[in-house]
Regions:
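Flexible, acidic/histidine-containing loops and adjacent segments that form or flank the divalent-metal
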Residues: 1-6, 82-191
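Conserved beta-strand hairpin/beta-sheet module of binuclear metal-dependent hydrolase folds
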Residues: 2-67
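Sterically constrained small-residue positions within well-ordered secondary structures
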Residues: 12, 28, 78, 164-166
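Active-site metal-binding loops of divalent metal-dependent hydrolases
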Residues: 13, 38-42, 77, 161, ...
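Conserved acidic residues
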Residues: 34, 70, 95
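A generic structural signal for short
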Residues: 46, 73-74, 132-133
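Metallo-beta-lactamase
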Residues: 69-80
C-alpha cells in the first residue's frame, strides 16, 4: 500500500462540522483535489468573541489560500453543518454538491419564514430558536443547491455504496447513508 500524501483539516467552527480534504491530483485545477465536507454555522453568535479560536469555514479557506473546491458535501441539513457552506459556495463555486436527498427535492421546497423568538421587546438579540435554526438550514440548503446548479455544478444524491468509490486519483470515499425507509420519511416530511 502506498502512502497517502493528502491532508485533512478539521476546521474549528464550533459545535458543527467543517472538514477540508486536499490531495494532489494532476487532473484537477492547480494539481490539487479539494473537498469541503459541511461548513459549520452561519450564525454570527457562533464566532463572537473569538476567544475559542472558532473561525468561519469561508474565512479559513481564504486565509489558507484555497482557490477552488471540486466537491462539496452536505452530510445533513442542520444549521451548524449546512449554513456555513453557503458563503463557501458563493466564493468558490464547487463542481459538485453531494447531499443525502433526491437531486430535485430542493426545487419543490418553499421558503420558510422565521419566528420572532430571537426578539425581546422590540429588540432582536440574534438568538435563533431551535426551530428557526432548522428553518434557516432548510432555506440555506435550497439556496446552496440553486447556487451550485446555476453555476454549472451538479447536485448529487449520496447513496450507500458497497465499496470505496474514487473521487480523485488520491481520494476514495465510502458513503454511509441513513436507512432507506428513514430517508424516505424525511423526504416526505420536508415536501
Amino acid at each position: 500500500m502506498r502512502a497517502w500524501i493528502g491532508q485533512v483539516t478539521f476546521i474549528n467552527v464550533g459545535y458543527g462540522e467543517a472538514i477540508l480534504v486536499e490531495a494532489p491530483d494532476p487532473s484537477c485545477r492547480d494539481d490539487m483535489f479539494v473537498m469541503m465536507i459541511d461548513g459549520g454555522s452561519g450564525e454570527d453568535a457562533e464566532y463572537d468573541g473569538n476567544d475559542t479560536g472558532r473561525i468561519r469555514a469561508a474565512e479559513y479557506l481564504e486565509k489558507r489560500g484555497i482557490r477552488h473546491i471540486d466537491l462539496m458535501v452536505n452530510t445533513h441539513i442542520h444549521e451548524d453543518h449546512t449554513s456555513g457552506l453557503l458563503p463557501v459556495a458563493e466564493r468558490w463555486r464547487p463542481g459538485a454538491l453531494w447531499q443525502p436527498f433526491p437531486t430535485d427535492m430542493w426545487t419543490e421546497m418553499k421558503p420558510l419564514r422565521m419566528t420572532d423568538e430571537g426578539t425581546i421587546g422590540h429588540q432582536n438579540h440574534g438568538i435563533l430558536s431551535t426551530a428557526d435554526k432548522f428553518r434557516t438550514a432548510l432555506n440555506d440548503y435550497k439556496k446552496l443547491c440553486r447556487l451550485v446548479t446555476e453555476c454549472g455544478g451538479q447536485v448529487v444524491q449520496m447513496k450507500p455504496q458497497p465499496a470505496w468509490q474514487p473521487v480523485s486519483s488520491q481520494v476514495r470515499v465510502n458513503i454511509l447513508a441513513p436507512d432507506r425507509a428513514v430517508l424516505e420519511q424525511q423526504v416526505d416530511d420536508m415536501r
